[in-house]
Design a protein with these regions (language model features):
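Extracytoplasmic small-molecule ligand-binding "clamshell" domains
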Residues: 1-15, 57, 72-85, 98, ...
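A ligand-binding cleft/hinge motif common to bilobed small-molecule-binding domains
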Residues: 3-15, 60-64, 85-120, 215, ...
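Bilobed "Venus flytrap"/periplasmic-binding protein-like clamshell domains
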Residues: 6-9, 25-80, 100, 170-179, ...
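Short beta-strand->loop
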Residues: 17-24, 28, 72-73, 110-120, ...
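Extended ligand-binding regions for polar small-molecule ligands
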Residues: 33-57, 99-103, 118-162, 193-201, ...
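Substrate-binding/active-site groove segments that recognize
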Residues: 48, 53, 275, 280, ...
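Export/targeting segments at the very N-terminus of extracytoplasmic proteins
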Residues: 391-439, 472-475, 489-493, 578-582
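Catalytic and substrate-binding regions of cell-wall glycan-acting enzymes that process beta-1,4-linked
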Residues: 498-574
Length: 582
């Protein structure tokens, strides 16, 4: 793979394949400010322009309509910034530069100017061999994922005011049957639904962050990569000392679990001289540490990335002789796993709550108020019944969880095929498809949009797709439309992540309304090139008649596309943390 600022050109495309563009640039002709003789392309006739012979700049100059441009070959090892410095010092008269490099050069060479663009919107990408089609598909998916999820890596410590200002609540959790999982494209889990309800009360977007292990949950919290941890975490003396713990929302017993075929073990005294397996970061370790010497058992440590549900599976398979688990998790596990049994509680009843940093007093107060109002209420009871009391649901959901080998949708193969052709991440298209139709190929909207991707019949005809209710054709139409809209926003000034968000908004409300919103954002002093907090805010104003009448494309019920982009972004972020690219 060639990773660098590699422009996609006709000559290069004959020899190698390219990834989807990572950005777009303008190619600028550059001279000194004192040189006023060069103002337009025609002025290059008979002039000497210094560029690398093998560069895309040389290719563009040779393809120019102006005859007589003389290319002076610079050393292939010479970087564009070095060439710009030579022009600034008067050692060369004219060169060509990407717009982003030119902007950087002005900081140390203010005597440079660009009189005109040689090429506009030149795509920059990674290069690879044409035979590496699988690698290209993986790179394309990665580039979409990186663009849309790069904010997940950002670390900042925020209390309530900052969370509301950013309009995002980052919740740290784990991918388990009792916390958060994906089932047939839908985001589910007891902790997830509680967190979503809390985010709704704050009026912010929920962002789920899944650290690589249980141990890393609190490490992420301390480093500012999340605002709170919601993963069925018990109140322990050590956690009370180091963190701010919320009011409890569950009370559980810590149960000793053995294989069902072990009929001799009736309680802890029967494990004298034997081992109990737990994670060191778990509350179980603290509980057992207080009594192991007295009762004569040993503690064996499990890997930190092993979840309690996986531990119970190993107990059932006879690989682990004894382990510990919270009573609610055991209750859920027993709906589909009859190979384990509980031999009773160890210690007192334990409180379960969310964990925050001690520098978040306002957030803790808000969470406590939420928990006290939530506990034993209608929504809470519904969630407990949904996740811990329904054996039929438990069995079906666990067998089809995306992280357990199930599919995101019934159409993963078709989505992968078409997304690959159009350089999109199949998980993004699946998130969009769920938003459009909940995976119903016969869905028809009130305005007549049809199929899995809810494409209008007239648009389907333009895209040369005949039967939108056929899953293969319906997905193809939606992917084609997303690719078309993505290409409308390939300005160098628009970040890759926002090109995708603009394309999603265009899919929902049309590119005309998005263009109107971008212009309105500029008039409001906002960025016309960023979606969240900028163009989305302007788009909402197009729902006001007095503002919409001044817009080229008029009135728009634009709360829908704003929610559409936000919900797909959220769903996609969750998909990529659980389901691999391939």
């Amino acid at each position: 793979v060639i990773i660098g600022s590699l422009a996609i050109t006709a000559e290069r495309s004959k020899r190698i394949a390219f990834s989807r563009p990572i950005r777009f640039v303008d190619q600028l002709v550059v001279v000194r400010t004192s040189d006023t003789s060069i103002q337009e392309l025609a002025d290059l006739a008979g002039q000497e322009v210094t560029v690398r012979e093998g560069s895309s700049y040389a290719e563009a100059l040779r393809a120019s309509s102006v005859k007589g441009i003389r290319i002076k070959a610079a050393p292939e090892s010479l970087q564009t910034l070095d060439l710009l410095q030579r022009v600034a010092r008067g050692e060369e008269a004219i060169t060509v530069s990407d717009s982003d490099l030119f902007a950087a050069a002005l900081s140390f060479a203010p005597n440079l100017r660009s009189p005109f663009k040689l090429l506009e919107r030149q795509p920059i990408a990674w290069g690879l061999r044409k035979s590496n089609s699988d690698l290209k598909a993986a790179i394309d998916s990665y580039l979409v994922e990186h663009a849309l999820t790069e904010s997940r890596e950002a670390a900042y410590r925020a209390d309530l005011d900052e969370i509301k200002r950013r309009k995002v609540l980052r919740v740290l959790t784990r991918n388990t049957s009792s916390t958060f999982f994906i089932y047939r494209g839908e985001q589910l889990g007891f902790e997830y639904e509680l967190a979503r309800e809390f985010a709704k009360t704050l009026g912010v977007r929920l962002e789920v962050v899944i650290p690589p292990s249980r141990e890393a949950l609190l490490q992420y919290l301390e480093s500012g990569r999340g605002d709170l941890a919601a993963a069925g975490m018990a109140r322990t003396p050590e956690r009370e000392r180091r963190y701010a713990l919320s009011a409890p929302y569950q009370f559980v017993s810590e149960l000793l679990i053995v294989p069902a075929k072990d009929t001799k073990t009736r309680g802890l005294p029967d494990l004298k001289g034997k081992s109990i397996w737990v994670r060191k970061s778990s509350s179980y370790y603290e509980t057992l540490s207080d009594i192991r010497d007295q009762l004569g058992f040993t503690i064996e440590l499990l890997p930190e990335d092993l979840e309690t549900e996986d531990v119970l599976a190993q107990v059932g398979a006879g690989k682990i002789p004894a382990a510990m688990a919270d009573s609610n998790i055991v209750e859920l596990e027993l709906t589909y796993n009859n190979r384990i049994r509980s031999v009773g509680p160890v210690g007192d009843v334990v409180e379960i709550g969310w964990v925050m940093r001690q520098d978040q007093p306002a957030l803790k107060a808000e969470v406590d108020a939420f928990m006290k109002k939530l506990y034993k209420g209608a929504f809470y009871n519904q969630m407990v019944s949904k996740y811990f009391k329904d054996p039929k649901r438990g069995r079906s959901e666990q067998s089809l969880r995306a992280d357990k080998g199930g599919a995101l949708s019934p159409y993963d193969g078709l989505v992968k095929k078409h997304a690959r052709t159009y350089e999109l991440d199949w998980r993004l298209i699946t998130a969009q498809m769920y938003q459009e139709s909940q995976f119903n190929p016969k869905a028809t909207s009130w305005v007549g949009a049809k199929g899995l991707m809810q494409v209008m019949p007239r648009t389907g005809q333009e895209l040369k797709v005949a039967n939108l209710e056929d899953p293969d054709q319906g997905i193809l139409a939606g992917v084609k439309l997303m690719a078309r809209y993505s290409n409308l926003f390939n300005s160098p000034e628009i970040p890759a992540k926002d090109r995708i968000r603009f394309a999603l908004a265009s899919y929902n409300c049309g590119p005309g309304h998005v263009d109107d919103a971008r212009e309105l954002a500029r008039e409001m002093g906002l960025s016309r090139n960023k979606w969240f907090g900028n163009v989305e805010q302007a788009l909402l104003l197009l729902g006001k008649r007095e503002i919409a009448k001044k817009a080229r494309y008029g009135f728009c019920r634009c709360d829908e596309p704003v929610n559409y982009v936000s919900q797909i972004q959220q769903r996609y972020e969750h998909y990529v943390q659980i389901v691999p690219m391939r």
